[in-house]
């Protein structure tokens, strides 16, 4: 959340938040998740949007089916068209942050409501039930998500074992590949 607020502010816009969980984490990983009641998440979204109507929405970690359903209900109420879903589903340690019931709701309901979904490779693997080892696999996974109702998919390729980062953008009209040098950091 803090990084998103800083990014939006640096780009000259105003960020508003609706917290879905309090996480105990640092730059190396997530230790625990303290959930916010789904009804309070719904209220946060609707009340915040009554004050200043957002031009766009970015959705991050949705850790349970009840939370996802409350976000879907809020989206149905506020009717914003520019929605980015960054499906935070796996901690850096590899631990799943979301249960299977929630994954199914995300795959079958939520991705149809967003304009862009931005999974990394482990998240794309969970959403598509395939193993991703190459750029072709990333494109294949994006096409699976298209077939599930996603409109635009940006698969982040930083988890591939390579000296460069290769991301792919796919929609019904085009496939774009972005390749850059990988910057290795401690975190």
Labelled PLM ranges:
Residues 182-187:
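Short glycine/threonine-rich catalytic loop with a Thr-x-Gly-x-Asp
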